Amino acid sequence: MMKRKTAVIFGIIIAAQLCLIPYAGVKVQAAELEEGQMFEDSSEDSETFGDVSIPDTQSAEKTEENEFGDDDGFGDGDVETFSAEDADQFRENMQELVLNVQDGEDITVKLNTLLAQARDKATDEKQCKVIVPPGNYTLTGTLHMYSNIYLYAEGATITKTSPRKEILLRLGDTQKSAGGYEGYRNITIDGGTWDSNYECVEDKGGPGGFVGFRIGHATNVTVKNVTFLNNLKSHFLELAGVKNAEITGCTFRGYWKEFTGGGQECIQLDACMPRIFPGYLPYDGSVCENIVIKDNTFEDVFAGIGSHSMMFDKPYKNITISNNRFNNLKKRAIWCLNYQDTVVTGNTMTNVGGGVYVRSVYTRNAHTVSGQEVSPEGNQYAENILIADNQITVLEPTVIDGKQWNGYGIWITGEVSLGSAGETIPSEDDDPENTANPTTNGIPAGRYIIRGVTARNNTISGNCDGIKFSLAEDCSCRGNTVRLSDSHTYNNMGISVAKGSNIRVSYNNLSGGNGYGIYAVGTEASKKICRIYGNTVSGFMKDGILASGLAAGSRIEHNRVSTSAANGILVKCIDKSVVDGNYSFKNKARGILLQRCESAMVADNFVSENAINGIELNIRSNHSSVQGNVCGSNKKSGLRIAGSKGISADGNSFRSNRGYAAEFIRSHISSYKGNRFEGNGYSNRIHVRNSKISKK
């Protein structure tokens, strides 16, 4: 049994390592505080995404204890003060065992024997360090690690030569453990090049692949300075039911390119369940918590880090993914599925299919444990996620697994599961109409909104959508730079919000793209206002900013919008909307256009050199106010009101517009005073047709 004193010491060591990066929740809370100071509140088909590994040559359905031969394939506590001296002293107490092996030798049996000896010697007070000397070696079976072992392989290259689809390394020599996070403890793997060598495997195209290292039911795990090579249809490193882990300084490279299905993340965070993580009983649904993944390199691989399976109502917690480098990835770099209290910061992603994907639930691969009570009220919480200071360059659109793949920089989405009429699940790489049958996996039908996500100070470029929010609430998108190519065959957008509520889009710099610069669309269920504030938007092929169907009182303020191929700012169906202090110029349609917006306020905007009118309100934008605006040098009229009543147009300035200073068509103008005119066409006049002006 683990002695608490030493367990605490080792836990402190891990805590100190984790503290190299600030606690995830602290960063996110700081970001939320910053946002709060700026704004005042107003008001993949289951088969495809299942683990494609062969389950350790043992049936995942068997629950009895199984002893593996060498060739088989297969705590909560307070953080205490820690000093570097404590860590050094603890490491000095390690026992060392050196593998006696010749260059070129198969080390499977010898290393397993040495690891078993280390298991018998190691204690919580005195770990064992097992050293694989530099050299080139082969592996023909699965290695078995145990608690309190430090496996050191710097300078060694270990190459799989077995034709079987079997794991390179796992914990324990039996499927059973104490479960939860108590099965194994104090595990370190340091150094070595571990080549999965898919070329040696027979029937590569047949069902399944194999995982490199599979680590489950453990606490205090470190994997560092390891090079992982040549994966076959699965993961290099997979963790489930792991608490307190750090993966740092590792390199992941190479995969079998003839297979493009499944997730194939290099690092997969998972849960201890039979279909998705076989071979680690009990299947109690333990997930990963307190994980740091930093300073790693991923190149020429299918996907980077993340999860494509989840436990319902049991999120992965306190995940930090920082300062990693991703180069030439077919799919996404990072997938945060059902994550909570997470930071994704300082990563560089170059030539990737997608950058960061954040999703509340994925019912096609969501799981429950036997006897778990579930309801639509479950899995509803603020994710508290920060995505900041990442550099993302996205590849051209392509076809993956027979389906069109359109890239993105950042995608933040909720889900509506089967049973909500008229709704569909936002999906990434499979059918957009993809739904899950709640009777097959116990997940209730309902809306699972994504909440509490901040995307800040990211730089995104390439052939993609920039930043996307779907079914999102209480989220922020601030200070990002998005430079898109417009050579697409689809309408890529700078920032898009679909069915959003209380989304704050501020101080972003957006350019290029075939679609909208900012696209923000809500639903009749949207109860909290959205704010689009201080953004710079230029060169999009549709409207620079489109806001439609958001909560009453939503605000579009102090944005600078130019050279859009349509309108600069288009606002539709938002009552009491505020369009204030914007600069909209050189757009190929109108500077600002409102449609079906009751009781809107359009104030203090500067609109110039637009190809049609400067400001236009039409289609029953009744009881709205247009005041204090400057409309100059537009090719038609400075202001046009059509099909609306109860409009006040006061204190505006009309200068050098080629058409009329102002036009009123089939409208009732309740107040018209204090306006100024200079150098407009048609003798500086206004034009009135089938309209009534109550007061000039």
Where do the protein language model's features map onto the residues?
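Sec-dependent signal peptide cleavage junction
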Residues: 20-35
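Right-handed parallel beta-helix/beta-solenoid
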Residues: 70-113
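N-terminal extracellular ligand-recognition/capping segment immediately after the signal peptide
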Residues: 105-112, 125-166, 173, 194, ...
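Short, T/G/N/S-enriched strand-turn elements that build extracellular solenoid repeat scaffolds
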Residues: 111-122, 138-147, 178-179, 236, ...
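Short glycine/acidic-rich loop motifs that flank beta-strands on beta-rich extracellular proteins
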Residues: 138-142, 160-166, 198-204, 211, ...
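Parallel beta-helix/beta-solenoid
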Residues: 146-148, 153, 184, 189, ...
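Right-handed parallel beta-helix
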Residues: 181-328, 333
